[in-house]
Curated annotation (Swiss-Prot):
Keyword Ribosomal protein tagged: no
Membrane topology: Multi-pass membrane protein
Subunit (UniProt): Component of the Sec protein translocase complex. Heterotrimer consisting of SecY, SecE and SecG subunits. The heterotrimers can form oligomers, although 1 heterotrimer is thought to be able to translocate proteins. Interacts with the ribosome. Interacts with SecDF, and other proteins may be involved. Interacts with SecA.
HAMAP family in alphabetical order: SecY
Principal localisation: membrane
Protein known as: Protein translocase subunit SecY
Keywords, alphabetical: Cell membrane, Membrane, Protein transport, Translocation, Transmembrane, Transmembrane helix, Transport
GO terms classed as biological process: intracellular protein transmembrane transport; protein targeting; protein transport by the Sec complex
Length: 437
C-alpha cells in the first residue's frame, strides 16, 4: 500500500503540495502549545492531570482544538468559531434571499459569502474567547480541581482583554492556515486542520484508558478499544460510501451538424447525505443549557434538573434527546442542502429525464420520495454512531472521552476519504494508475 503512494511524491508539483500541507500542519500543531499571557500553566497542568479524561462540557470543543482549549493556548478556540460561522451562514442562505442570490452568482458570490463567514468567525471568536476566559477566571473550567480558581491569578480587566485578543488572533491565524492549504496544498484546509485536531487527541486518550485499565496492566482494555475503533472505522467507511444512484438519460439534440446528448448518467444520493453536521448541531444545542447552569452557579430546582438530566451524558433523558435531535437535524439539513425542484428544473433545462418518470414536478416528487426513504436509515445510523461513547461509558465504564467517538470517527473518515480521492484524481490526470485499487 505504501508503494502505491510513491507516484504522489515522484510528481514535482504534487510533492510540493503535499510537503506544503505537512508544513502548515506542523505550524498549526506548534501553535496549540504557545501560551497566552495571564495564565498560570503549572495550575493548568495540575488541573488537566486531575481531570484525567473527564473534560465535561468542554470535551467537544477541546477535541476540535486538538487539546489546546484546556491548555488555554493561543489556538485554544481552534477552528470551532469557523465551523459555527460556516453552519450559520449555510442556514441563513436558505432564509435570507440576498444570501441565496449571492450563492447563485458563482465565484463572485461565493467569495462574498466567504468574506461574511470570516467576519462572523471573528465575532464568534471574541464571544467564545470571552466566555472561556470568564470560565477560567471563575474556576469552572475544571470542575473538581483544587487550584481551578488560581488558573488566572490576575483578575484585572486589562489581562482579560489581552487574553481574549490573543485567542481571537489565534483563530484568525488558524483560519488563514486553512485557506493556505486549500489554495496551495492538498484537500480542504479547514477539514484537514479538523482532522489533525481530532487525531492529535487520540494518543493521550488511548494512554489514559491503558493507565486506568485493570486487566494485564491495562493492555487488554487498550487492545479492545483499538479493535472497536477499527471496526467502527470500517462500518463508517462502508456507510459513507453507500449511495442510491438515480439513473438519468439525456435526449439527443442536433445543434448545427453536431449531435449532443444521448448519454446516460446518474444522480448519487448518499445514505448519509447530511454528513456530521446533525451531530454538531445536536451537541451544540445540548451544550447551551448546561453552560448556562455552569455560569449561573445556581442551586435552584431547574438548575439541578438540567445538571442531572441534560449535562450528564449517561443520563437517560440526555441520551434520548440527543438521539432524536440528531435524527431531526439530519432531515432538516438534507431538506435545506438538497433541493429536488432545482435539480429537476436543471435536468429539464438540459433535456435530462429519469426513465419512467415525467420531467418537471413528477421528477422533483420522485427525488424527494427517494431522499426521504434513504435519510431514515442514514439518520438512525448517525444517532447510533454518535452514542457510541455514551454506550461505552455506561456499559463498560470506559473513559468519558472515548477516543473513537461518533463525531471524531465520522469527521476523520469523511476528510480522509475526500483527501485520498483528491490525490487519486490528481495522479490520474498525470496518467498514473492511482492507489485506490
Amino acid at each position: 500500500m505504501l508503494t502505491a503512494f510513491a507516484p504522489a511524491f515522484k510528481t514535482p508539483d504534487l510533492r510540493k503540495k503535499l510537503l506544503f500541507t505537512l508544513g502548515i500542519i506542523v505550524v498549526y500543531r506548534l501553535g496549540t502549545h504557545i501560551p497566552i499571557p495571564g495564565v498560570d500553566y503549572k495550575n493548568v497542568q495540575e488541573c488537566v492531570d486531575q481531570a484525567s479524561g473527564n473534560q465535561g462540557l468542554f470535551g467537544l470543543v477541546n477535541m476540535f482544538s486538538g487539546g489546546a482549549l484546556l491548555q488555554i493556548t493561543v489556538f485554544a478556540l481552534g477552528i470551532m468559531p469557523y465551523i459555527t460561522a460556516s453552519i450559520i451562514l449555510q442556514l441563513l442562505t436558505v432564509v435570507i434571499p440576498r444570501l441565496e442570490a449571492l450563492k447563485k452568482e458563482g465565484q463572485a458570490g461565493t467569495a462574498k459569502i466567504t468574506q461574511y463567514t470570516r467576519y462572523l468567525t471573528v465575532a464568534l471568536a471574541i464571544l467564545q474567547g470571552t466566555g472561556l476566559v470568564a470560565t477560567a477566571r471563575s474556576g469552572a473550567l475544571f470542575s473538581g480541581c483544587t487550584v481551578a480558581g488560581q488558573i488566572v491569578p490576575d483578575q484585572a480587566i486589562f489581562t482579560t482583554v489581552v487574553m481574549v485578543i490573543c485567542m481571537t488572533a489565534g483563530t484568525c491565524v488558524v483560519m488563514w492556515l486553512g485557506e493556505l492549504i486549500t489554495d496551495r496544498g492538498i484537500g480542504n484546509g479547514m477539514s484537514i486542520l479538523m482532522f489533525i485536531s481530532i487525531a492529535a487527541t487520540f494518543p493521550s486518550a488511548l494512554w489514559a484508558i491503558k493507565k486506568q485499565g485493570e486487566l494485564a496492566d491495562g493492555w487488554i482494555e487498550f487492545g479492545t478499544v483499538i479493535l472497536v475503533g477499527l471496526v467502527m472505522v470500517g462500518l463508517v467507511v462502508f456507510v459513507e460510501q453507500a449511495q442510491r444512484r438515480i439513473p438519468v438519460q439525456y435526449a439527443k439534440r442536433m445543434i448545427g451538424r453536431r449531435s449532443y446528448g444521448g448519454t446516460s448518467t446518474y444522480i448519487p444520493l448518499k445514505v448519509n447525505q447530511a454528513g456530521v453536521i446533525p451531530v454538531i448541531f445536536a451537541s451544540s444545542l445540548l451544550y447551551i443549557p448546561a453552560l448556562i447552569v455552569q455560569f449561573s452557579n445556581s442551586t435552584a430546582g431547574w438548575a439541578t434538573w438540567i445538571t442531572k438530566n441534560l449535562a450528564d451524558t449517561a443520563a437517560t433523558p440526555h441520551i434520548i434527546l440527543y438521539f432524536f435531535l440528531i435524527v431531526f437535524f439530519a432531515f432538516f439539513y438534507v431538506a435545506i442542502s438538497f433541493n429536488p425542484e432545482e435539480v429537476a428544473d436543471n435536468m429539464k433545462k438540459y433535456g435530462g429525464f429519469i426513465p419512467g418518470i415525467r420531467a418537471g414536478r413528477p421528477t422533483a416528487e420522485y427525488l424527494s420520495y427517494v431522499l426521504n426513504r434513504i435519510t431514515w436509515p442514514g439518520s438512525l445510523y448517525l444517532g447510533l454512531i454518535a452514542l457510541v461513547p455514551t454506550m461505552a461509558l455506561a456499559g463498560f465504564g470506559a473513559n468519558q472521552n472515548f477516543p473513537f467517538g461518533g463525531t471524531s470517527i465520522l469527521i476523520i473518515v469523511g476528510v480522509g476519504l475526500e483527501t485520498v480521492k483528491q490525490i487519486e484524481s490528481q495522479l490520474q490526470q498525470r496518467n498514473y494508475e492511482g492507489f485506490l485499487r
